[in-house]
């Protein structure tokens, strides 16, 4: 679902205008600019992404009806609408294959013995 449609759903559910919610919903879908298929969701569509949304937007905000809203509620709705549940970051990461580059650069150690240097990987 596009951020605008998420925002309209939030306005129907919580009151106010769709513009009150659009920035939160756009936050979750910004990862599409880095990876334009559904795998972009691995970056923010999780309990971790919901936590990050609270860090970015604060725990609450006031909508245009004057109602104090929890960012977490809006963020959870976004993830649930797209995923059907709220996955953990571990659920996403467990679905990925480990690659050697993920561990960072591999340093070769050199041991000097009586016979000269020996390279060990």
Which stretches of residues belong to each language-model region?
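N-terminal membrane-targeting hydrophobic helices
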Residues: 1-121
């Amino acid at each position: 679902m596009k951020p605008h449609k998420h925002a309209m759903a939030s306005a129907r559910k919580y009151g106010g205008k769709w513009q009150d919610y659009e920035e939160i919903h756009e936050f979750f879908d910004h990862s599409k600019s880095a990876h334009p298929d559904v795998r972009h969701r691995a970056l923010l569509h999780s309990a971790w992404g919901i936590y990050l949304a609270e860090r970015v937007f604060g725990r609450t905000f006031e909508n245009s009806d004057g109602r104090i809203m929890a960012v977490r509620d809006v963020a959870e709705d976004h993830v649930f609408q797209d995923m059907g549940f709220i996955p953990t970051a571990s659920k996403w990461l467990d679905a990925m294959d480990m690659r050697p580059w993920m561990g960072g650069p591999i340093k070769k150690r050199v041991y000097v013995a009586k016979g000269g240097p020996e390279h060990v990987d």
